[in-house]
Amino acid sequence: MPATNARRWVPDVLRDAGEDDTVVYTVGVRASLDPESWSLIFMECYDAEDEQNISLGMDTYCLVVGPGQWTVYGGVVECELSDDRLILRLTERAAEKLRTPAEMGFGLALDSTKLEVLRRGLRRVLTSGRANAVPQRLVV
């Protein structure tokens, strides 16, 4: 497989989800319980009114893919969550920054508690910050 395609790999199934609200609210999913496994973290906008954040385009939610800590602000066009599937469509720019495909579909192997954490967290994070960065389609 060419290196350019290798950087676009994402897991088929996500098996863990969690949230943290100590400083900035985050919700994340990962491929396994292994702390080094592939992960996707959604961070709520911290200060949408800050002039520097606005000038840098950091006045909205943030996504981080690990390992590697690839980061982008905004960029989710569509997000759809069901009991067993998470579908994301990103802008090409966001996908390039995160080293992921622009369209991703994940199977979910989450219990009902973790699924509710993810549902609540995605709704909270993806509607934070600049209004024009909110996904055009958000079904959670």
Tell where the protein language model's regions lie, with residue ranges.
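Charge-rich, low-complexity N-terminal segments
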Residues: 1-40
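A broad structural signal for short, well-ordered beta-strand segments within beta-sheet-rich domains
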Residues: 7-14, 67, 71-76, 118
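Short polybasic amphipathic segments
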Residues: 27, 60-62, 86-89
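Extended Gly/Ser/Thr-rich low-complexity repeat segments
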Residues: 36-49, 97-111
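Acidic, aromatic-enriched beta-alpha/helix-loop junctions
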Residues: 37-80
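A short, structured loop/turn motif at beta-sheet edges
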Residues: 80-84, 111-114
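A short, structured beta-strand/loop element
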Residues: 81-96
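Mixed-charge, glycine-accented linear interaction segment located at domain edges/termini
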Residues: 98-140
